[in-house]
From Swiss-Prot:
Residues 24-52 form a coiled coil. Keywords: Coiled coil, Isopeptide bond, Ubl conjugation pathway. It comes from the Bacteria. InterPro entries: Ubiquitin-like_Pup. Pathway: Protein degradation; proteasomal Pup-dependent pathway. HAMAP family: Pup. Protein modifier that is covalently attached to lysine residues of substrate proteins, thereby targeting them for proteasomal degradation. The tagging system is termed pupylation. Residues 1-11 have a biased composition (Basic and acidic residues). Residues 1-38 are annotated as: Disordered. This is Prokaryotic ubiquitin-like protein Pup. Residues 21-58 are annotated as: ARC ATPase binding. The keyword Coiled coil applies.
Length: 64
């Protein structure tokens, strides 16, 4: 399955405006969700076309 990684940065001037970035945060989450969905769709397409080769390559690289 897909995993989402989050990078947190230390404090700064941006923390001085409480609630000011709520809309920007929501927009960023929506963009990340859209990008993730696109990536998963691409993976699904590859697996539909060539699942056997994908599994064979995965096992050769040490996957279980």
């Amino acid at each position: 399955m897909a995993q989402e990684q989050t990078k947190r940065t230390g404090g700064g001037d941006e923390d001085d405006t409480p609630g000011g970035d709520g809309a920007a945060g929501q927009e960023r989450r929506e963009k990340l969700a859209e990008d993730t969905d696109d990536l998963l769709d691409e993976i699904d397409d590859v697996l539909e076309e060539n699942a056997e080769d994908f599994v064979r390559a995965y096992v050769q690289k040490g996957g279980q």
